[in-house]
Amino acid sequence: HSCLNDPVCLVMAVGRKYQLRPMAKSEFMNIPVLGWLLKKAGVFAVDRGKSDVTAIKTAIKYLKSGEKVLLFPEGTRVKGGVDKHGHESEAKSGAAMLAVRTGAPIVPVYIPEKKKWFRFTNIVIGEPYYPHVESKKGTAEEYKEIAEELMERIHALGAKAA
């Protein structure tokens, strides 16, 4: 995703019919008023600096109970395919791991980088799909392949939107 309001745009696009549980970096949850509002909106925190077992367990709990978890595959904001540190962006394996372990589908979503305030943003929601793995729980290599496929699907949605 490319800016801070992407989760808000997506939550508004799907409406109340598809309540999403967004995952946000833990630093946001510690901001006095914002953190309270995010918690009330169903957002849960992830500590991005390490494998956050609590966030993973929370996401698994939500998915197994039929809720929808919103996370961005790159794990950070990206502009022009480059993260804020100047590195080429690549998908993390979190979405793949959660889908494999819970049996939940992955829904690719394209949100354009260029948005105008107080204007409609054309968000493209792809078809849900279930990633395939050979091993029972999936391996790191399988998760990486699934994450790469997810990014390919997102880019294909972006090409359709253009």
Q: Where do the language-model regions lie?
A:
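Catalytic core of membrane glycerolipid acyltransferases/transacylases, capturing the structured
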Residues: H1-K50
